[in-house]
């Protein structure tokens, strides 16, 4: 599964998801106890809210027999970009997450390729980001 490439030519796939989360983790000392911080303070609830937006569209696409994305789904993906922009403006940690993981730019890739498969791959990538975020917060 390869969704796209970064400006440096690195493939954006499930391995990239692990790598980008790992590279954006830091340990913060909070009154004598160490706390793992991802993407400059991205909270689990904020990350899950973003995933919920994608899962709403995922359900429609997954249950469809079409191999291409319907106009309704394409409209929802366009709106998803708006939501990403809004959340980025409200929360610097969300902006960092979106910029480092390319989740907003990948929506454009999904819209351009317009296939069910590429959208489902995008969902897997986003789920991997959430899974690795959970893993690295609990680990170490």
UniProtKB/Swiss-Prot annotation:
Q: Enumerate the Pfam families for this protein.
A: Csm2_III-A
* Claim: Mitochondrion is one of the keywords in the record: no
**One GO process term, biological-process aspect:** defense response to virus
KW Plastid (keyword) present = no
Q: Which GO molecular function, any one, fits this protein according to its record?
A: RNA binding
InterPro entries from the UniProt entry: CRISPR-assoc_prot_Csm2_III-A
- Keyword terms of this UniProt record: Antiviral defense, RNA-binding
> Record's CDD domains?
Csm2_III-A
Another remark in the UniProt entry says: Encoded in a type III-A CRISPR locus.
State the family it belongs to.
Answer: Belongs to the CRISPR-associated Csm2 family.
**What is the name of the protein in this document?**
CRISPR system Cms protein Csm2
**What is the originating organism of this protein?**
Enterococcus italicus (strain DSM 15952 / CCUG 50447 / LMG 22039 / TP 1.5)
């Amino acid at each position: 599964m390869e969704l796209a490439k970064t400006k440096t030519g690195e493939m954006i796939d499930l391995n990239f998801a692990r790598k980008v989360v790992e590279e954006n983790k830091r340990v913060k000392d909070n009154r004598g106890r160490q706390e793992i911080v991802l993407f400059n303070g991205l909270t689990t609830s904020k990350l899950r809210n973003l995933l919920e937006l994608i899962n709403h569209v995922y359900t429609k696409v997954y249950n469809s027999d079409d191999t291409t994305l319907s106009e309704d789904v394409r409209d929802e993906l366009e709106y998803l970009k708006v939501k990403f922009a809004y959340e980025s403006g409200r929360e610097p940690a969300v902006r960092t997450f979106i910029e480092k993981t390319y989740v907003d730019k990948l929506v454009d890739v999904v819209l351009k390729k317009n296939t069910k498969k590429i959208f489902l791959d995008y969902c897997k990538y986003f789920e991997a980001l959430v899974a690795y975020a959970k893993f690295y917060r609990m680990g170490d």
